[in-house]
From Swiss-Prot:
Residues 701-712 have a biased composition (Basic and acidic residues). Belongs to the SMEK family. Residues 750-761, 768-790 have a biased composition (Polar residues). It comes from Xenopus laevis. Serine/threonine-protein phosphatase 4 (PP4) occurs in different assemblies of the catalytic and one or more regulatory subunits. SUPFAM superfamilies: ARM repeat (SSF48371), PH domain-like (SSF50729). The gene is ppp4r3b-a. GO terms for molecular function: protein phosphatase activator activity. GO terms for biological process: DNA damage response; regulation of double-strand break repair. Pfam families: EVH1_PP4R3, PP4R3. Residues 682-712, 750-820 are annotated as: Disordered. Residues 1-100 form the WH1 domain. Residues 682-694, 798-809 have a biased composition (Acidic residues). This is Serine/threonine-protein phosphatase 4 regulatory subunit 3-A.
Length: 820
């Protein structure tokens, strides 16, 4: 007994009077003890589970239909059907049923004839041949055929049944012969009916029918039928477009005829889906899912066939990179690769990985480097699209290539620099290409998609490469458009204000906005790399010049850059902003904006509100001390008054701390803290240098020491120390940067109401015990003044620098007293 002969589908009739498929299995007839009789058993072919166990009842009416169906009812509302794969299997089981019931197997119904409604019910069951009678395929029946096709679309089962009938009778080819007849006779009514018929057949969503309709023999006639939409006054000329306008170009001759046919077919079917067929309504959205799948699998097959033909791909790459290749040919080659990569998006992830690795091994990136630098706009645009596919697929692969390339090439011809230059030189007034390239650059420099392995850290290596070899190319337009060759005094604040004319050209402003967006991304994600670059180039000052631009969007980009920096709450950045007086252009922009309530106004106020809410003390102090007079009239928000309140609260807090500590301990504590702060600052710079692997400003290469922030900051600290020495008797004193410094330099004798100017008088006038002290503390006071530059931290400071020098000279003679 053959398995295929006994292979069946089991169906049951549901409450909606539709047949439900219960599974496929193999049927047998055997005696079942539990049921006390011969029974039909169907076991699933997938796992052997029991799909059906039905006793052959002597009184049940079994009906044999269409040579491969057996239908019966076991209860009032429980109808069953077995659909056999082969007629022979159906005959064998039918004989068993007839044997149990004592009937002649030649009959088609074992009991009284089944009522007509039962037969009609089973007409709804799928996978049965000839369950629908198709009208004769002739001109006079076209309207009837169109009505039939249209009527079944609302019922999935009826669609299935019609599709089977169309397939079995070769009906589609007969319809297309009628189409040619109607065209020859100019039978417009018949052509309109054929449009409805062919459109309806497409909506049957059957792959077997698509194979017929989209064959070389039939597809152009199918397109022809779809030209005659009854809703249009004149037919469309789709066939003319496909045969005359759309030209198939073989950049390299394709020797595989099957591949060529598959490419033609895919293009035409895609055209039918995208251009000819109307957009499906919400009720029809699933009707064309098989058509989409048909195109999808065609593309997969095309990519696979091309990928396997290494000779073909090698030849394409060779011609693409050959200097002798003319521009037209190169354009065709690049467009081919663009389509090739677009098709690859249909592949499964593992197959797509293999596809791009094949392209990488063949040299796609060096080839792109060549074509992206060409003058032809179409070629550059196609190359950009290909590059975007590669970056989207594997940013790491692109990064690895450019880092290897950097070891052998000049910066000017590096792939990333070529990309940056294309972004900068985009001739599109709307900078469409530049926006796309900026997005790709951001993906490449995004640490989130960089790998960290045991052997190497991609993030560190690539960012070092990018900042050393590429960042200067990216920022060149920004620095060129913000040069500071003319300076003038600001009458309001007495600060330096640039008189540079900002770029008013809209396209240039757009480009600078893109560059600023990328730099803002770097501030958020690159920490010390971008920090070094900003300091070395004094970049924030240059960016803030753009606050003067007539293009508000550019001024907002500049402000956003500063806002991101301040948002980090990094004191290193804060000191840089204070030292450079970089709030000046922001406040100028706020005042120049006047009473206008716009985005610029809100963004600037939000910046200061952030400083207030986060209580960034150094910036609060700087703003209040230097700009409050100008900001005080702004009362429609409480931000600036809030900053002043914060400032005064901090001032009071420091004063209270000062007054709560005895003067001798104050002197000890605060002097130590001041010196410890300096040590911490030096330690911070040292740690920063170690972390980055390069100095904040390389000392050997430095040509303008005055621009070096760390060195300038040391000078600033020296100035601060001198200021402290001058004002040591006055508490508190405001430093030049606007922060409050509490330094206590009183001598011990001063604390005790005596005047003393040297170490001897300190020793002579210090009482034996001071503030719970003892004579041992006396000794420590006189001995720890040994050296202001030594390893010991002095507890007492002196107002006279010369006295300090004398003590320094005398220190060797005092050192033995440490042990006494």
């Amino acid at each position: 007994m053959s398995d295929t002969r006994r292979r069946v589908k089991v169906y049951t009739l549901n409450e909606d009077r539709q047949w439900d498929d219960r599974g496929t299995g193999h049927v047998s007839s055997t005696y079942v003890e539990r049921l006390k009789g011969m029974s039909l058993l169907v076991r699933a072919e997938s796992d052997g589970s029991l799909l059906l166990e039905s006793k052959i009842n002597p009184n049940t009416a079994y009906q044999k239909q269409q040579d491969t169906l057996i239908v019966w009812s076991e209860a009032e509302n429980y109808d069953l059907a077995l659909s056999f794969q082969e007629k022979a299997g159906c005959d064998e089981i039918w004989e068993k049923i007839c044997q149990v019931q004592g009937k002649d197997p030649s009959v088609e119904v074992t009991q009284d004839p089944i009522d007509e409604s039962e037969e009609e019910r089973f007409e709804e069951m799928p996978e049965t041949s000839n369950l629908i009678d198709l009208p004769t395929c002739e001109l006079g029946k076209l309207e009837e055929i169109a009505d039939l096709v249209t009527s079944v679309l609302s019922s999935p089962i009826r669609r299935e049944k019609l599709a089977l009938a169309l397939e079995n009778e070769g009906y589609i080819k007969k319809l297309l012969q009628l189409f040619q007849t109607c065209e020859n006779l100019d039978n417009t009514e018949g052509l309109h009916h054929l449009y409805e018929i062919i459109r309806g057949i497409l909506f049957l969503n059957k792959a077997a029918l698509f194979e017929v309709m989209f064959s070389d023999e039939c597809i152009m006639d199918v397109v022809g039928c779809l030209e005659y939409d009854p809703a249009l006054a004149q037919p469309k000329r789709h066939r003319e477009f496909l045969t005359k306008t759309a030209k198939f170009k073989e950049v390299i001759p394709i020797t595989d005829s099957e591949l060529r046919q598959k490419i033609h077919q895919t293009y035409r079917v895609q055209y039918i889906q995208d251009v000819i067929l109307p957009t499906p309504s919400v009720f029809e959205e699933n009707f064309l899912s098989t058509l989409t799948s048909f195109i999808f699998f065609n593309k997969v097959e095309i990519v696979s066939m091309l990928q396997e033909d290494e000779k073909f791909l090698s030849e394409v790459f060779a011609q693409l990179t050959d200097e002798a290749t003319d521009d037209d040919k190169r354009r065709e080659l690049v467009n081919f690769f663009k389509e090739f990569c677009a098709f690859s998006q249909t592949l499964q992830p593992q197959n797509r990985d293999a596809f791009f690795k094949t392209l990488a091994n063949l040299g796609i990136l060096p080839a792109l480097e060549i074509v992206m630098g060409m003058d032809d706009l179409q070629v550059r645009a196609a190359a950009t699209d290909i590059f975007s596919y590669l970056v989207e697929f594997s940013p790491s692969m692109v990064r690895e290539f450019v880092m290897q390339e950097a070891q052998q090439s000049d910066d000017d011809i590096l792939l990333i620099n070529v990309v940056i230059e294309q972004m900068i030189c985009d001739s599109d007034p709307e900078l469409g290409g530049a926006v796309q390239l900026m997005g790709l650059l951001r993906t490449l420099i995004d640490p989130e998609n960089m790998l960290a392995t045991a052997n190497k850290t991609e993030k560190s290596e690539f960012l070092n490469f990018f900042y050393n070899h590429c960042m200067h190319v990216l920022t060149a337009p920004l620095l060129a458009n913000t040069s500071e060759d003319k300076l003038e005094k600001d009458a309001v604040f007495g600060s330096i204000k640039t008189s540079t004319v900002c770029p008013d050209n809209y396209q240039t402003a757009q480009l600078l906005a893109l560059i600023l967006e990328l730099l803002t991304f770097c501030v958020e994600h690159h920490t010390y790399h971008i920090k070094n670059y900003i300091m070395n180039k004094d970049l924030l000052r240059r960016v803030l010049i753009l606050m003067n631009s007539k293009h508000t969007f550019l001024a907002l980009c500049a402000l956003r850059f500063m806002r991101r920096i301040i948002g980090l709450k990094d004191e290193f950045y804060n000191r840089y902003i204070i030292k450079g007086n970089l709030f000046d252009p922001v406040i100028n922009a706020l005042l120049d904006n006047g009473t206008r309530y716009n985005l610029l106004n809100s963004a600037i106020i939000e910046l200061f509100e952030f400083i207030r809410v986060e209580d960034i003390k150094s910036l609060t102090s700087h703003i209040v001390e230097n700009f409050y007079k100008a900001l005080e009239p702004i009362e429609y928000v409480q931000t600036f008054k809030g900053l002043k309140t914060r400032y005064e609260q901090e001032k009071d807090r420091q004063s209270q701390k000062l007054s709560s500590v005895p003067s001798i301990l104050r002197s000890n504590r605060f002097r130590r803290d001041a010196r410890a702060l300096e040590d911490d600052e030096e330690l911070w710079f040292n740690e920063d240098d170690e972390e980055e692997g390069e100095a904040v400003v390389p000392p050997v290469e430095k040509t303008k020491p005055e621009d070096d922030f760390p060195e300038g900051y040391e000078k600033f600290l020296e100035t601060k120390k001198a200021k402290e020495l001058e004002d040591k008797e006055n508490l508190p004193k405001r430093t030049s940067v606007g922060a409050f410094k509490f330094t206590f330099s009183h001598s011990v004798s001063a604390a005790n109401g005596a005047n003393s100017t040297n170490s001897k008088s300190v020793a002579a006038h210090t009482p034996p015990a001071t503030s719970n002290g003892s004579s041992s503390k006396n000794t420590s006071l006189t001995t720890t003044v040994a050296s202001t530059k030594g390893s010991l931290i002095g507890l007492v400071d002196y107002p006279d620098d010369e006295d300090e020098e004398e003590e320094e000279d005398a220190s060797p003679r005092k050192r033995p007293r440490l042990g006494s």
